[in-house]
């Protein structure tokens, strides 16, 4: 069997490197999806992921020029007095379990109203006036454009006589699916969505192939919406079949071995369910390829999902021989259930492998054996083995015990080996075991960095993995089953990794917990306590923050003598499930405390100071930004707050946010209301306070985090903050764009240029 592979196309965290991203907020990084042989292609400008997506890097600091080794790129701008009108106040008072809470900008939740659109247009115009006036933008654009031309490539996957993979060349907006017959065969483009829209706003969301490679299913969506339409193409000829199935977001397609049909997940059509539920009620269906009257899938039988909750997330998978159907049901980011069924038994029923406990399980089937990776009573994960004939929990046998390191992502059966990816202090490692759990080899990693994919299945005679680090773009390695690695493809760039130093530092958080952080800068940089620095973090949804190439365009900052800092906060997966749970629900404040402590460490150890420290976060990381700049407005000069959650009392009422209640809680519950109200950024803006300069960035077709968060927070802060014109509160709402996944290179470049123009202006970088 082959697991589902998740990659954020811009970046399973808005997710760099597969963070899913609310990350991949909808996609679950530790997907136990069996032989789905599906690639959720959310390429990588990001890193996770998470999911990722995009994560633009930026931040700002002192308006006075920094005189160290910064070369001329952008100058400070005198914005002059602002004529931007204040937003209308219309207080709505809610009663939360006896607590009266005012909301002065409820009307800005309606993104379709003429008044809201006028507000947005005025804000965008004001933001453009300021950012377009930053000197040196053309130089920034030129360099950032060259950095984005680095491109990307995925690991190849073998399917019958074919190898399939994606690659994005430097100037392309979206990745292209390539196929070749044999590993050394001539490649040809199979699916190129760049031809579908000149501006690149039709995205390749995911793709999936069967064991014989006859057909490939893939999803596309417009304007970053991620509301995929499922298509099928014939691999040998490139002929597009008539199938066109709507509402197939992250469809987790599982092909029958003969490619006569596939299982998949989809969402209901609008009008078929009560309004507001169209983005929930994900269920599993089966589509037969032989029925020309059913190309839209509307006659496809429901296979699984009756009786599930509105926010349960169901996926199907198949063993490589197609004999066993596996259903995985996620309930939040801490729990799933796994069921298995013998498809050859006409009287077969689903058998539960799991027993309803609050753990995660990831399943692989090879032959008649099941391999289960789980954090059951093992926060850093372990591996069990069971027979398909007796799959119940009581019959499992542990073959890889918990260790000091974290089993990352999912273990994979490739050939007659078990490949185990690890995290060691937030850096990737890879080991090869026998199918009985005996270690055969550790695969040497090129440097400290991150695995970005693992290709192969139980019938393969070889494997592939991708690797990336902060200053080194992705390289794909071919791997023998005994652990010998050679380069298969590498992405070239003009960045010399030898010029930069990556160090990992540890510091104490508020409660004494030791927290790590990567710090990247030019070799030989003299630390005088005033170096412009960008600090970024995520800290949520069991997603790891690990090294990725040029995250957020940070190479630009390094080239100008600055520092990039990447902190591994509680709430993530860097140190297992305990680390995750220490930063969720009633313990979410730990995430914010960790980030604040990271900033204080950088200042105390002479990396930077308050006037030269900028911070950046997106999605769940945008919530992080809102929490820390409302709790410690004195600590930062500038903030990039991207696609953020900010009104935590009402977040669950918009888009897909009910899926996140297991991570955050809900104000509808009296106890959980107390947790959320204690830190909800929208409810902690204090009138007369001087805040950092802030650039809120959001998009009109974001189907994960509603733009209302950024609109309301902008209006509130512009009215309340005592900032001068040199510390503006800005809103930038992009059009024909979403949460980040699938954002075309052209739009990514515009995001980067605005972000870094803002940062360099605020940091005083010349």
Descriptions of predicted regions:
Residues 3-6, 15-18, 36:
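Short hydrophobic alpha-helical segments enriched in small aliphatic residues
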Residues 53-435, 439-462, 468-474, 478-482, ...:
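Beta-propeller folds
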Residues 168, 375, 468, 536-540, ...:
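Glycine-rich His-Gly loop
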Residues 553, 566-766:
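Active-site-proximal cap/loop segments of hydrolase catalytic domains
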């Amino acid at each position: 069997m082959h697991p589902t592979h998740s990659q954020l196309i811009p970046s399973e965290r808005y997710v760099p490197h597969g963070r899913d991203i609310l990350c991949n907020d909808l996609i679950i990084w530790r997907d136990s999806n069996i032989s789905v042989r599906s690639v959720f292609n959310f390429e990588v400008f990001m890193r996770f992921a998470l999911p990722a997506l995009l994560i633009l890097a930026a931040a700002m600091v002192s308006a006075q020029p920094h005189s160290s080794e910064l070369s001329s790129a952008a100058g400070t701008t005198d914005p002059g007095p602002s004529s931007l009108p204040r937003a209308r106040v219309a207080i709505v008072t809610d009663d939360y379990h006896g607590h009266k809470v005012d909301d002065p900008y409820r009307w800005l939740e309606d993104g379709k109203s003429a008044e809201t659109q006028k507000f947005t247009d005025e804000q965008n115009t004001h933001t453009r006036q300021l950012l377009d006036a930053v000197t040196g933008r053309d130089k920034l654009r030129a360099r950032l454009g060259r950095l984005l031309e680095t491109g990307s490539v995925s690991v190849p996957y073998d399917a019958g006589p074919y190898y399939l993979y994606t690659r994005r060349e430097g100037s392309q907006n979206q990745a292209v699916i390539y196929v070749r017959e044999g590993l050394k065969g001539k490649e040809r483009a199979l699916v190129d969505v760049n031809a579908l829209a000149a501006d690149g706003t039709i995205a390749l969301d995911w793709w999936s192939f069967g064991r014989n490679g006859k057909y490939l299913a893939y999803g596309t969506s417009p304007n970053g919406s991620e509301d995929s339409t499922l298509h099928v193409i014939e691999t040998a000829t490139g002929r597009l079949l008539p199938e066109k199935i709507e509402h197939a977001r992250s469809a987790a397609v599982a092909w029958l071995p003969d490619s006569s049909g596939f299982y998949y997940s989809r969402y209901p059509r609008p009008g078929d369910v009560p309004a507001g539920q169209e983005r929930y009620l994900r269920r599993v269906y089966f589509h037969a390829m032989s029925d020309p009257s059913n190309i839209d899938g509307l006659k496809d039988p429901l296979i699984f999902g009756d009786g599930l909750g509105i926010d349960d997330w169901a996926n199907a998978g198949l063993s490589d021989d197609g004999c066993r159907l596996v259903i995985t049901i996620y309930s939040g980011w801490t729990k799933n259930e796994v069921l298995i069924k013998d498809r050859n038994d006409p009287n077969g029923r689903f058998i539960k492998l799991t027993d309803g406990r609050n753990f995660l399980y990831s399943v692989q089937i090879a032959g008649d054996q099941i391999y289960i990776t789980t954090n059951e009573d093992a926060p850093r994960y372990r591996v069990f083995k069971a027979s398909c004939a007796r799959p119940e929990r009581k019959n499992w046998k542990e073959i890889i015990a918990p260790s000091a390191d974290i089993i990352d992502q999912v273990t994979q059966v490739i050939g007659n080996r078990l490949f185990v990816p690890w995290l060691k202090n937030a850096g990737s490692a890879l080991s090869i075991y026998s199918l009985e759990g005996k270690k055969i080899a550790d695969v040497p990693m090129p440097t400290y960095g991150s695995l970005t994919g693992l290709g192969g299945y139980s019938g393969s005679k070889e494997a592939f993995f991708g690797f990336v680090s902060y200053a080194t773009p992705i390289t794909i390695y071919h791997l023998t089953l005994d652990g010998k690695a050679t380069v298969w493809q590498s992405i070239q760039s003009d960045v010399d990794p030898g010029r930069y130093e990556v160090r990992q530092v540890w510091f104490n958080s508020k409660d004494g917990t030791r927290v790590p952080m990567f710090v990247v800068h030019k070799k030989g940089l003299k630390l005088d306590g005033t170096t412009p620095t960008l600090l970024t973090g995520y800290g949520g949804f069991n997603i790891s923050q690990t090294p990725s190439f040029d995250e957020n365009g940070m190479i630009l900052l390094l080239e100008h003598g600055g520092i990039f800092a990447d902190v591994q906060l509680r709430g993530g997966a860097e140190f297992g499930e305990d680390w995750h749970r220490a930063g969720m629900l009633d313990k979410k404040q730990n995430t914010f405390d960790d980030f604040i402590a990271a900033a204080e460490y950088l200042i105390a150890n002479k990396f930077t100071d308050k006037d030269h420290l900028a911070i950046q976060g997106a999605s769940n990381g945008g919530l992080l930004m809102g929490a820390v700049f409302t709790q410690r407005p004195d600590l930062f000069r500038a903030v990039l707050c991207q696609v953020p959650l900010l009104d935590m009392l009402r977040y669950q009422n918009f888009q897909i946010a009910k899926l996140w209640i297991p991570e955050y809680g809900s104000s509808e519950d009296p106890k959980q209301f107390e947790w959320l109200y204690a830190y909800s950024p929208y409810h902690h803006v204090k009138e007369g306070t001087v805040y950092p300069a802030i650039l809120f960035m959001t998009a009109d077709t974001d189907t994960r985090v509603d733009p209302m968060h950024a609109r309301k927070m902008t209006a509130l802060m512009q009215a309340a903050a005592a900032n001068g014109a040199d510390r503006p509160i800005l809103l930038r709402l992009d059009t024909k764009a979403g949460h980040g996944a699938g954002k075309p290179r052209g739009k990514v470049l515009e995001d980067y240029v605005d972000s870094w123009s803002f940062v360099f202006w605020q940091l005083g970088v010349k």
